[in-house]
């Protein structure tokens, strides 16, 4: 089956049933060490994960690690340009769950990003990025502890699909000519819009299927959270991109109010029900005024639409959601993308799960990570219906490779996500406890040490940080 790999002689496969993992007590899990500092952070990660499993389960559960190759290491073993050997793809497909360090993409043509390629090959349509603050972590924000969110990012569509043509190419010229001549409408206000002939062109596909399966996972996750955190916010720029990001919002609401009707309430529905609860004699029109402050400035036609919305909500869900019942449901709302970047800083405790498209999610997850201490402590997971890959969210930092000084927190916390995905919560909790205690005790690597006040004079090595985490399992 494999050209150059030898799977572990013991262990069992993780399988998937209806999109959920079925995990044996001795799973075989492929790992990719990663390029650059992967040589340092993977051994530290393996040490911590193994120690947590041993401590939590006393030998009843055990991971059998299976080394596979991608990036620079793959080229060394399989030959030049073999950055994604078939062996590796076969192993991940066979064993279902994998973890990896950072990967770089060789300069030149071909695959633009190894990470994006993996997501597309295995249809890992959900990127999950938790942003949680560990007390003591240096942060530029005054109150980073208030931010505790999870970004759900659609992973397979949007401009990351890579359908684009460079300026001046035959494809760009043909597409621009076709759009200008055949598809771009003339409007009374602006006349005939035109794409400049010296433009590069990219396609931004957003599908109902892709949008709703992402929002479905976000809602299912929200249902598992404490009641105060059961909220999903649809993040979009639908006010400008009316046929891509606008429908993402609409399809998200559609899913929430059909498939999850008994378990979800939209923000506007909560206002309508809440208004009636406060004043049982409230008229439909008065309620409409309250949910739309600009009601009086609207045309009669638009006012009628809002009144119809109020009436429809009260007729359809009052029995199941009224009289305060909506407070026990998962709240689904939406926010404009540029606004949410501001609000995770100014009103961070108002949000829980942010569900969004690929590009927005890329920006948003990194911005949120900065609030709680940076990408060095930012885990990530890419999850589909038949596979899941957990990964470092930072780059390869080749200048630090082999120096045993880089922060392994991102991959270690990605390992925590993997353990939680597998249902091994006790081991995951031990690692989170160990990381929290190490940071609180100022036992940290240089990137955190140099920002702490007062400054830590002797930061730990990468390997020492891993050992410090393990030492706090018994605290």
Curated annotation (Swiss-Prot):
SUPFAM superfamilies: Isocitrate/Isopropylmalate dehydrogenase-like
Effect of loss of the gene: Essential, it cannot be deleted.
Residue stretches in coiled coil: none
Temperature remarks: Activity increases with temperature up to 70 degrees Celsius, although activity declines after a few minutes at this temperature.
One GO term (biological process): glyoxylate cycle
MF terms (GO), sorted A to Z: isocitrate dehydrogenase (NADP+) activity; magnesium ion binding; NAD binding
Binding-site positions, Mg(2+): 362
Cellular compartment(s): Cytoplasm
Cofactor: binding comment: Binds 1 Mg(2+) or Mn(2+) ion per subunit. Can use Mn(2+) or Mg(2+), but the activity is twofold higher in vitro with Mn(2+).
Major enzyme class: oxidoreductase
InterPro entries per record: IsoCit/isopropylmalate_DH_CS (IPR019818), Isocitrate_DH_NADP_dimer_prok (IPR004439), IsoPropMal-DH-like_dom (IPR024084)
PANTHER family: ISOCITRATE DEHYDROGENASE [NADP]
Protein name (database record): Isocitrate dehydrogenase [NADP]
Protein species of origin: Synechocystis sp. (strain ATCC 27184 / PCC 6803 / Kazusa)
Gene: icd
């Amino acid at each position: 089956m494999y050209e150059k790999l030898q799977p572990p002689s013991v262990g069992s496969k993780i399988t998937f049933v209806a999109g959920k993992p079925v995990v044996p007590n001795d799973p075989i899990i492929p790992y990719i060490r990663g390029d650059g500092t992967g040589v340092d952070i993977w051994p530290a990660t393996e040490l911590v994960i193994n120690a947590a499993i041993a401590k939590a389960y006393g030998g009843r559960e055990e991971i059998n690690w299976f080394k596979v190759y991608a990036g620079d290491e793959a080229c060394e073993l399989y030959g030049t340009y073999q950055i994604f050997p078939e062996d590796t793809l076969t192993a991940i497909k066979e064993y279902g769950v994998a973890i990896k360090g950072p990967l770089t993409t060789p300069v030149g043509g071909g695959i633009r990003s190894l990470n994006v390629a993996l997501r597309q090959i295995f249809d890992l349509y959900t990127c999950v990025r938790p942003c949680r603050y560990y007390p003591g972590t240096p942060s530029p924000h005054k109150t980073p502890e208030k931010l505790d969110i999870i970004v759900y990012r659609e992973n397979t569509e949007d401009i990351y699909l890579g359908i684009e043509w460079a300026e001046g190419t035959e494809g760009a010229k043909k597409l621009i000519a076709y759009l200008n001549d055949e598809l771009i409408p003339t409007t009374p206000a602006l006349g005939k819009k035109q794409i400049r002939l010296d433009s590069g062109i990219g396609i931004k596909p957003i599908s109902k299927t892709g949008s709703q399966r992402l929002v479905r996972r976000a809602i299912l996750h929200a249902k598992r959270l404490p009641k105060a955190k059961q909220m999903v916010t649809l993040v979009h720029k639908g006010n400008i991109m009316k046929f891509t990001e606008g429908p993402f919002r609409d399809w998200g609401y559609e899913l929430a109010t059909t498939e999850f009707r008994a378990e979800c309430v939209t923000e506007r529905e909560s206002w309508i029900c809440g208004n009636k609860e406060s004043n049982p004699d409230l008229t439909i029109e008065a309620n409409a005024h309250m949910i739309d402050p600009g009601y009086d400035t609207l045309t009669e036609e638009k006012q009628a639409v809002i009144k119809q919305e109020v009436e429809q909500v009260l007729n359809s869900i009052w029995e199941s959601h009224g009289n305060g019942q909506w407070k026990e449901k998962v709240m689904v709302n939406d926010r404009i993308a540029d606004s949410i970047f501001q609000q995770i800083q100014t009103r961070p405790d108002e949000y829980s799960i942010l569900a969004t498209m690929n590009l927005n999610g890329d920006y948003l997850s990194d911005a949120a990570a900065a609030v709680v201490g940076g990408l060095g402590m930012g885990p990530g997971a890419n999850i589909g219906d038949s596979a899941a890959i957990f990964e470092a969210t930072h780059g390869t930092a080749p200048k630090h490779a082999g120096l045993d000084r880089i922060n392994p927190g991102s991959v270690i916390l990605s390992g925590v996500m993997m353990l939680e995905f597998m249902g091994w919560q006790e081991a995951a909790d031990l690692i989170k406890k160990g990381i929290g205690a190490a940071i609180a005790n100022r036992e940290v690597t240089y990137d955190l040490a140099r920002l702490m006040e007062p400054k830590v004079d002797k930061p730990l090595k990468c390997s020492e940080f891993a050992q410090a985490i393990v030492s706090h399992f018994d605290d």
